[in-house]
Design a protein with these regions (language model features):
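Small/polar glycine-rich anion-binding or flexible loop at a beta-alpha turn
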Residues: 185-193
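Short, well-structured beta-strand/strand-turn elements
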Residues: 178-184
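Conserved beta-strand/loop scaffold segments within soluble protein domains that form the structured core
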Residues: 1-171, 175-178, 193-194, 200-208, ...
């Protein structure tokens, strides 16, 4: 399976002891399911614009883990909606989720991220963070991170942040000779590079493709 895929809708199923890194790029509506077997590990990135995206992931046995990132861009012509549901059904499993969006003028974004931890589980970790980077005006944003925990011996956290290129940051960057557009580009680039740093085998060509899709 290729590291980077364009508009591939087939399910992802990791076998026992399999470790996999996948980047999905989508610009069309789609739905995808992911299954994790025992002792498997998935690092997964979704890059999207102008899309209606829905993912459901669930564990099929214990001792498996996933790290999932979403990178979205939205403006007046590219509304984005989506949902990510992660179901941890077995002990000694973990999910680390970060949903990051770049919102330009007249952006429309509706994202529901959720982690469900079943009853009677032990040593389970769940983390869900939604980060919305505001780069424009007149933005419509609906975000609802949800964490449902039905076990006691677990660690779990969730939250949502809204970040802007505030006036202090902007003044500092412009005092160094950068325009507002260049300052926004630096901010977006930092987030993208942070995510891509989790993918050890990504090529420079793939990096350039992702930066181009998400460029301000």
């Amino acid at each position: 399976m290729k590291l980077l895929q364009n508009n591939i809708f087939s399910p992802i199923s990791l076998a026992t002891h399999q470790s996999l890194q996948i980047i999905d790029v989508f610009d069309v509506p789609w739905t995808k399911t992911i299954e994790l077997e025992s002792h498997s590990s998935l690092t997964y990135l979704v890059v999207g614009s102008d899309a209606d995206i829905h993912i459901e992931l669930f564990t099929k046995w214990s001792h498996c883990s996933c790290t999932i990132f979403w990178l979205f861009i939205s403006d007046a012509k590219h509304p984005v909606t989506g949902s990510l549901k992660v179901s941890l059904k077995h002990s000694q499993t973990s999910a680390n989720i970060e949903l990051i969006s770049f919102l330009h003028d007249w952006a429309k974004l509706g994202i529901d991220g959720s982690i469900y931890i079943d009853p009677y589980l032990d040593q389970v970790h769940g983390r869900l963070l939604e980060q919305n980077i505001v780069l424009g005006k007149n933005i419509s944003l609906r975000t609802l991170p949800k964490l449902t925990v039905s076990s006691h011996n677990v660690t779990a956290a969730h939250g949502a942040n809204i970040d802007t290129l505030d006036q202090q940051k902007l003044f500092y960057m412009m005092s160094r000779g950068l325009t507002k557009q260049q300052s926004q580009t630096l901010l977006v680039t930092w987030y993208i590079d942070y995510v891509l740093g989790h993918f050890t085998d990504i090529s420079d060509v793939n990096k350039t493709q992702i930066h181009t899709i998400l460029a301000p």
